[in-house]
């Protein structure tokens, strides 16, 4: 058995899980998510837990087992608690602002960069150098945070750019100035 796949997913109070064929739908206080899982994976609701099982010990089924369980667990967490990712802007004059729903980044280009968060996503700017992406779908939250970071990735010499709050930038030593090679 998969170590992750065999663990049951606890359903908190206020969350409802329904299964129709191979489509799992999770409703909770923050919203609703549904996802189609592979046809071979068996998902059952037993009391206040969701159990994910596989039909055989094939390598393919083993790999899907843990994945499917984690996807269901992320759906349950998303509709009950939600997910968030924090980003920081490092650099002189680098700042973020919110215009309506859009996020406007000033990060050293000749023009401000506008990013529209997708449906079900929310962007907060508590400070000009801090961005928080929130939502119920972990995949979408991570993808939007990665897209924001990709606008100006941190460079290794001064560390300027947009980075995740917990990310540590590996620094490089710059060239040493001097009269190397001069006669």
Swiss-Prot record:
UniProt keyword list: Ribonucleoprotein, Ribosomal protein, RNA-binding, rRNA-binding
Gene Ontology CC: one annotated term: cytosolic large ribosomal subunit
GO molecular function: rRNA binding; structural constituent of ribosome
The keyword Cell division is assigned to this record: no
Gene Ontology BP terms: cytoplasmic translation
S-S bonds: none
Keyword Cytoplasm: no
Highest taxon above the source species: Bacteria
Family recorded in the similarity comment: Belongs to the universal ribosomal protein uL6 family.
Function statement: This protein binds to the 23S rRNA, and is important in its secondary structure. It is located near the subunit interface in the base of the L7/L12 stalk, and near the tRNA binding site of the peptidyltransferase center.
Subunit field text: Part of the 50S ribosomal subunit.
Alphabetical list of HAMAP family matching this protein: Ribosomal_uL6_B
Full protein name: Large ribosomal subunit protein uL6
Protein source organism: Heliobacterium modesticaldum (strain ATCC 51547 / Ice1)
């Amino acid at each position: 058995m998969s170590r992750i796949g065999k663990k049951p997913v606890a359903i908190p109070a206020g969350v409802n899980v329904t299964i129709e064929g191979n489509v799992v739908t999770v409703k909770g206080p923050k919203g609703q998510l549904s996802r189609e899982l592979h046809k071979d994976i068996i998902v059952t609701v037993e009391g206040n837990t969701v159990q994910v099982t596989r039909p055989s010990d094939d390598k393919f089924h083993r790999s899907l087992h843990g994945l499917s369980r984690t996807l269901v667990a992320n759906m349950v967490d998303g509709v009950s608690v939600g997910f968030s990712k924090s980003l920081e802007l490092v650099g002189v004059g680098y700042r973020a602002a919110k215009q309506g729903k859009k996020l406007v980044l000033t990060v050293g280009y000749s023009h401000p960069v506008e990013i529209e968060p997708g449906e079900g996503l929310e962007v907060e700017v508590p400070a000009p150098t801090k961005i928080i992406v929130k939502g119920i779908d972990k995949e979408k939250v991570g993808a939007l945070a990665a897209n924001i970071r990709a606008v100006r990735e941190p460079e290794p010499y001064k560390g300027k750019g947009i980075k995740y709050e917990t990310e540590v930038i590996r620094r490089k030593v710059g060239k040493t100035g001097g009269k190397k090679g001069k006669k």
